[in-house]
Amino acid sequence: MANEFRVCDDCDATNLKTLLPRLKSVDPDAKIEIGCQSYCGPGRKKAFAFVNNRPLSAPTEDELLEKVQKKVK
C-alpha cells in the first residue's frame, strides 16, 4: 500500500511551497491530498501533516520531516 500525505492549504504554520517538495522527496510515489484537515488548533502554531491517517506536528518543518520519515512505509 502506498503512503498518503494530507496537508492543509489554509493553516498559518504550514508552508506548502516548501513542505510539498520535501514530502515528495521522502516518497515520490505517495498520494498527496491538499485541503482542510480539521486540525486548525495545532495548525495555527505548528507545522503538521497527516501521514497514513496519523497526525504529526512539530514546531518546525525540519522537525516535522524527521517524524514523517519515521512513519512512512
Swiss-Prot record:
<dbReference type="InterPro" id="IPR009910">
    <property type="entry name" value="DUF1450"/>
</dbReference>
<comment type="similarity">
    <text>Belongs to the UPF0741 family.</text>
</comment>
<dbReference type="InterPro" id="IPR020880">
    <property type="entry name" value="UPF0741"/>
</dbReference>
<dbReference type="Pfam" id="PF07293">
    <property type="entry name" value="DUF1450"/>
</dbReference>
<protein>
    <recommendedName>
        <fullName>UPF0741 protein BPUM_3395</fullName>
    </recommendedName>
</protein>
